[in-house]
Amino acid sequence: MAEHGLKIAVVGPQRTGKTLLCRALAEQPILLGEMSYQPTAAVRIQEISRVLGIDRVKVQFWDVSGSVQYQSYWPVLAKEVDGLLMVIDPNRPEQERDLETFYRNFAEPNNLYTRQCMVMAIQVQKEGGGLGGWQGLQGGLKKLSQSYVAINPANPAAGVQEAYSHLDVLFQGALQSKKEALESSYMNQEDQ
């Protein structure tokens, strides 16, 4: 089984559930109650392993702060990103403009294809909470893959399972692009 690594930047406005998602995916403890929200200072990195077909993939989630206070770090954090997961609060569709800024700062410098980018609307819900309804993106980013996931911080397993059903598509797209770039670099070396 071939082993690969992927760097996925997880970006979006503050308080959209980026850290909750990353911690739940990495099976890390999730804080509840008054301490449940702790703003990310620059970046947090979580790692997971997935098997995609015949490939074992070690995924690093770079959970990037949504605060403009850390915007000067974005070029460094965006360096050599293999994929981009943009997170939005489905109850705040005006955040789509913010996602366009993240796209320009993380996807465009890395020449990412649409298959390497995804928008995920995360509904942070309490026990018995409803899913609500998200209409999807309306602007320039509507060409990207979009998903909607509800995560209950007290019991995130169902939300994690739903998230993986979408994220595996992102991982496969990022892995395919990485393999193609590697093959292209080998071909260019042989031509010299």
Curated annotation (Swiss-Prot):
GO terms for molecular function: GTP binding. Pfam families: Roc. CDD domains: Ras_like_GTPase. Keywords: Cell projection, Cilium, Flagellum, GTP-binding, Nucleotide-binding. GO terms for cellular component: motile cilium. It comes from the Eukaryota. It is found in: Cell projection, Cilium, Flagellum. Its main location: other. GTP binds at residues 12-19, 62-69. Component of the intraflagellar transport (IFT) complex B. Functions in regulating the cellular pool size of both complex A and complex B and thus plays a critical role in determining the cellular availability of IFT particles. Component of the IFT complex B, composed of IFT88, IFT70, IFT52, IFT46, IFT27, IFT25 and IFT22. PANTHER family: DRAB5-RELATED (PTHR24073). Belongs to the small GTPase superfamily. Rab family. This is Intraflagellar transport protein 22. It comes from Chlamydomonas reinhardtii (Chlamydomonas smithii). The gene is FAP9.
